[in-house]
Amino acid sequence: MTGLEIWLLAIGLAMDCLAVSIASGIILRRIQWRPMLIMAFFFGLFQAIMPLLGWLGASTFSHLIESVDHWIAFAILAFLGGRMIKESFKEEDCCQRFNPASLKVVITMAVATSIDALAVGVSFAFLGIKSCSSILYPAGIIGFVSFFMSLIGLIFGIRFGCGIARKLRAELWGGIILILIGTKILIEHLFFNN
C-alpha cells in the first residue's frame, strides 16, 4: 500500500471514532480536556493495536491462502465498508444519554470502534506485509488519525450538537473509502500482478 492509501484507510477506519466522539461531545456539552484527551487516547490506542493483532494472527497462516488473499482482503474491506454505509442510514438518536467520560464506557467504545481495524490487520497479512516493522507504520498512522479525529469529533459535538452530526454521515464516507480501497486491491491483483 502507498502512503496515501494508508492515510485514506486510516481516515476510513477513524470514521466510527469520529461518529462516537461527536455523540459523546454532545453529551459532554462543554470542553473538558482531561476526559476528552483520555477518550481520544483510548480510541487511538485500540485503533493502533487491533491491526497489529489481526496481522499477527493472520500472518501465521497467510502462506496457505496466497492464491486468494486479494479476494479475502476485498471481501473484508467491502463487508466492513458496506456495514458502515448501512449503519449510516439507521435512524438513531445521537443525543442518547450515557456517561462517555467513564473509563468503562470509554474502553468499551474504543474496543467497539476498533473491530474494523482488527479485520484490516488480517487483510494486511494477505497483502504481503511480512515483518513487524512493516506493520508498525500503518498501525501508527491509523492510531494517530483516530486520536486526532476523535478529538475533533468531541469538540465538534460539544460545539454544534445533534443537527450537524446527522448531516455529517461520517460512517457513509468511511464505508465508501473502505470499499474503494478493497476494489483497488482486487483490481491490482487480478489485472496488474505479474
Curated annotation (Swiss-Prot):
Assigned keywords, A-Z: Cell inner membrane, Cell membrane, Ion transport, Manganese, Membrane, Transmembrane, Transmembrane helix, Transport
Main subcellular localisation: membrane
GO molecular function: manganese ion transmembrane transporter activity
Subcellular localization: Cell inner membrane
Pfam families according to UniProt: Mntp
Cysteine-cysteine disulfides: none
GO cellular component: plasma membrane
Transmembrane domains' residue ranges: 8-28, 36-56, 61-81, 109-129, 138-158, 172-192
InterPro entries membership: Mntp/YtaF (IPR003810), Put_MntP (IPR022929)
Mode of membrane association: Multi-pass membrane protein
Family: Belongs to the MntP (TC 9.B.29) family.
Function: Probably functions as a manganese efflux pump.
PANTHER family: MANGANESE EFFLUX PUMP MNTP-RELATED
Protein name (Swiss-Prot/TrEMBL): Putative manganese efflux pump MntP
Organism, scientific name: Bacteroides fragilis (strain ATCC 25285 / DSM 2151 / CCUG 4856 / JCM 11019 / LMG 10263 / NCTC 9343 / Onslow / VPI 2553 / EN-2)
Gene that encodes it: mntP
